[in-house]
Amino acid sequence: MTSNTPLPPCSILLLAGGRGQRMGGQDKGLVEWHGEPLIVHLHRKVRPLTDDLIISCNRNRERYAPFADRLVSDDEEDFPGPLAGIRAGLKAARHTHLLVLPCDVPRIDLALLHNMREAAGLNSEKPLMLRHDDHWEPLLCVIPVALLPAFENAWNAGERSPGRVMRNLDAQALVCPDNDPRLANLNTPELLSSHNTVSD
């Protein structure tokens, strides 16, 4: 990848609006890792990268508010899934692109975030998703905000998979190494515990 690729201006969306089933119903972004809520780790990584930091959350808004420029919520009740949060983020975004991250990837680093933006700039009209171990990571992506109508059309047609929506829009892949530790989803108590010996 060339170092002179322009980086698209990005709003950043942190997804923290899920039901937290794998965490026993806990609000996942507020679960602690290394003594701090997961959302704090993500905020520390991304805050210097944008002046438009959005958090998608459906509860505990007062606890998330200090870590975002704006909060968004799903437009339907009963936790309809991450595509609802992405749609809300696209509607709120002030920049041309929306970089999306789940709240349970505290080991992501600045180099990968830079690479995501740089790769998105190579074909700025297409969504970009991370890919590793022969599968996509649809919640680690960069989406042109101009594609909001396509996301809305897919939602209204009954689609609920962000990955399918983006693949249907000819998503680009940013390929990461197999078993890349930066992509570890710490979405169960067991995974949080197993990664507690490794700092972010």
From Swiss-Prot:
Pfam families named in the record: NTP_transf_3 (PF12804)
Q: Which GO terms describe its biological process?
A: bis(molybdopterin guanine dinucleotide)molybdenum biosynthetic process
Q: Give the UniProt subcellular location, in the record's own words.
A: Cytoplasm
The UniProt entry, under InterPro entries, shows: MobA-like_NTP_Trfase, Molybde_CF_guanTrfase, Nucleotide-diphossugar_trans
What's the cofactor?
A: Mg(2+)
The UniProt entry lists the main location of this chain as: cytoplasm
Q: Which GO terms describe its molecular function?
A: GTP binding; metal ion binding; molybdenum cofactor guanylyltransferase activity
UniProt binding sites for Mg(2+): 104
Binding-site residues, GTP: 15-17, 28, 74, 104
Q: Known catalysed reaction(s)?
A: Mo-molybdopterin + GTP + H(+) = Mo-molybdopterin guanine dinucleotide + diphosphate
User: One GO CC term of this entry?
Assistant: cytoplasm
Q: What does this protein do?
A: Transfers a GMP moiety from GTP to Mo-molybdopterin (Mo-MPT) cofactor (Moco or molybdenum cofactor) to form Mo-molybdopterin guanine dinucleotide (Mo-MGD) cofactor.
Q: Which family does it belong to?
A: Belongs to the MobA family.
* Binding partners and assembly: Monomer.
**Which protein, by its recorded name, is this?**
Molybdenum cofactor guanylyltransferase
Query: Gene behind this chain?
Result: mobA
